Amino acid sequence: MRKIGISDIEDIALGAALLGAGGGGDPYIGKLLAIGAVKECGEVSLIDVDELSDDDVVVPVASVGAPTILTEKGVGSNEFTKLIDMVGSYYGKKITAIMPIEAGGVNSMLPIAAAARLGLPMVDVDGMGRAFPEIQMVTFTIGGVSASPMLFIDEKGNMGLMETINNKWVENICRAGCTACGGSVVSTEYVMTASQVREFGVRGIVTRSQELGRAIRGIKNCPENMTPEEYFFDYTGGFRLFKGKIADVLREKTLDRKSGSAGMPRPI
């Protein structure tokens, strides 16, 4: 176990933005929420899943919808409290820990804010190691874990619970509900035991995000005998696939998501 403070949040947000490759949107608003929660409620305990008992209940917390809309609406502490209370009432069990569902954008930050507000630890694991666009696109689906019952809440206090026939239908119905709620909701899905998280989760993703963020911040201080690119690859164990120049970026926003594309004439 270790503590996550404000400087750690800065690095995690930066590294998660890299891992997300644009998925999950800009982590900026989520970073502000996480920093605000830590300032008010104290640092968050980051734990490994092996520190939990097999039957402990772990709850992912995420935002569904367009991150740019979340920037306008924000997320208050009441949403986290009501959501987790509803999960506990439904399952009749005490919630042991929070976890992120993806690495990237806002959803790398909201679990930190939730854990701080709720006084719960956060598990160093997620369901993809990146940021994919749909709810069913996680390792937990591959492992046969159900995303439902999914629970969600908007900033007005509207709450919903759905049970579906498969994880793709969670995505379909949630998007419709998200649109009706103004374009973004806070949700929890894939409520699992620690045993399931241990078997199917992508472990160490928060730590990895922090390491990448630290490498990016320190890239200007690389040794004289290395280029910034060489330093970053050496630090992270990465490698270059190709090199090119971005010539065009197109961003599109709908009520339930934001998408985009980047154009590169040809690799260099």
Put a short name on every predicted segment.
Residues 1-37:
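N-terminal phosphate-binding or glycine-rich loops at protein starts, especially the Walker A/P-loop
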Residues 26-31, 80-81, 101-113, 129-134:
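Short glycine/serine/threonine-rich phosphate/pyrophosphate-binding segments
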Residues 52-68, 137-177:
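A structural-propensity feature for long, helix-poor, extended segments
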Residues 52-96:
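Glycine-rich oxoanion-binding loops at beta->alpha junctions
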Residues 93-107, 121-125:
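A short, small-residue-rich loop immediately preceding and capping a beta-strand
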Residues 117-136:
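Short, acidic/small-residue loops that bind anionic groups at enzyme active sites
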Residues 150-219:
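Phosphate/diphosphate-binding glycine-rich loops and adjacent basic-rich segments that engage nucleotide
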Residues 260-265:
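Conserved small/polar residues in nucleotide/adenosyl-binding loops
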